[in-house]
């Protein structure tokens, strides 16, 4: 065999090595060059807008959804944000969003099911059409979005964060439909987390109190806000703490199943007390009632297995 000139030999070796390496698609290449991507629904205002701004500012890439042209334009002007037109009640919008994200080549690490609407009517007063719309947005919306995007989340070993509410725990008159929809998110998240765990993915729920958002303002004006709501301290606070909780739920190493985040201590106390009251009611009067000592032992065991607080 003839000796090849050194330049030709170098080229031959390079070609041989290139042939031995796996082919990297354009999508794979793009995914390695960009930040982790998160999809946030209902990003035009309130909690969704704050989540979008926080994640984008911290270097994550955010697909932020909205329905109106002006909102899409405003979201698209934020660095690290791509605005996506999406109405969670429209399957065709969801399908189009899936294709948009797939074609982006970044994959999808996180899904934040935030889109929601409020109500201010009792069961007797609420029209069935209003009830149907609320369930379509608040309950069916997260379900549809999760079905559509779960394959991408599982592929990335990522996380799904649902935005619940303390109204899912602290029901009050005039909020029956809203409380129902948010309580459904609690159960949905618990089941979803168990389904995702064997696949290496995670689901959790962030439960905000009454921050300065349009939904809470409307509840206060109508006099149907959950117990513990006031027009003073809580209304002075924008939902920055909610964005903090969502970022932790998405990215901290050992995420919790639930993140309670409220603007004032009174709301935290009422929420925890309500859970304790429900525990007492469940335990009382059934064939396998636990006594005081047994309940305290259960509480101690639960506290001992809880995550240590980070300073």
Residue ranges and their predicted role:
Residues 44-45:
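Conserved glycine-rich cofactor-binding loop
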Residues 86-96, 128:
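The beta1-alpha1 cofactor-binding region of Rossmann-like NAD(H)/NADP(H)-dependent oxidoreductases
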Residues 122-123, 130-132, 157:
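Substrate-binding pocket helix/loop in short-chain dehydrogenase/reductase
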Residues 146, 181:
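Active-site helix of classical SDR
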Residues 165:
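Residue(s) in the substrate-gating loop at a strand-loop-helix junction
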Residues 170, 191-202:
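Active-site-adjacent segment of SDR/Rossmann-fold oxidoreductases
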Residues 198-260:
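SDR active-site lid
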């Amino acid at each position: 065999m003839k000796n090849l000139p050194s330049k030709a030999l170098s080229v031959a070796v390079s070609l041989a090595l290139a042939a031995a390496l796996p082919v990297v698609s354009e999508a794979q290449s793009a995914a390695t060059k960009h930040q982790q991507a998160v999809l946030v629904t209902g990003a035009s205002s309130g909690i969704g807008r704050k989540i979008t701004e926080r994640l984008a500012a911290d270097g994550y890439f955010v697909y932020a959804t909205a329905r109106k042209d002006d909102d899409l334009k405003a979201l698209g002007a934020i660095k690290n944000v791509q605005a996506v037109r999406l109405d969670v009640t429209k399957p065709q919008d969801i399908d189009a969003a899936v294709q948009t994200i797939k074609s982006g080549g970044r994959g999808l690490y996180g899904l934040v099911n935030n889109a929601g609407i409020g109500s201010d009517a009792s069961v007797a007063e609420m029209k069935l059409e209003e009830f149907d719309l609320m369930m379509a947005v608040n309950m069916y919306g997260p379900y549809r979005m999760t079905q559509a995007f779960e394959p991408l989340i599982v592929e990335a070993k990522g996380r799904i964060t649902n935005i619940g509410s303390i109204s899912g725990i602290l029901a009050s008159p005039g909020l029956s439909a809203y409380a129902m929809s948010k309580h459904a998110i609690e159960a949905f998240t618990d089941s979803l987390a168990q389904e995702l765990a064997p696949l290496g993915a995670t689901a959790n729920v962030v439960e905000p109190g009454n921050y300065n958002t349009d939904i809470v303002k409307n509840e206060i004006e109508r006099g149907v806000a959950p117990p513990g709501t006031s027009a003073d301290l809580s209304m002075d606070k924008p939902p920055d703490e909610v964005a903090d909780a969502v970022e932790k739920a998405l990215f901290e190493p050992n995420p919790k199943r639930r993140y309670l985040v409220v603007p004032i201590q009174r709301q935290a106390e009422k929420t925890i007390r309500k859970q304790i009251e429900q525990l007492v009611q469940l335990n009382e009067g059934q064939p396998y009632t636990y006594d005081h000592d047994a309940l305290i032992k259960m509480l101690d065991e639960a506290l001992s297995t809880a995550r240590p607080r980070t300073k």
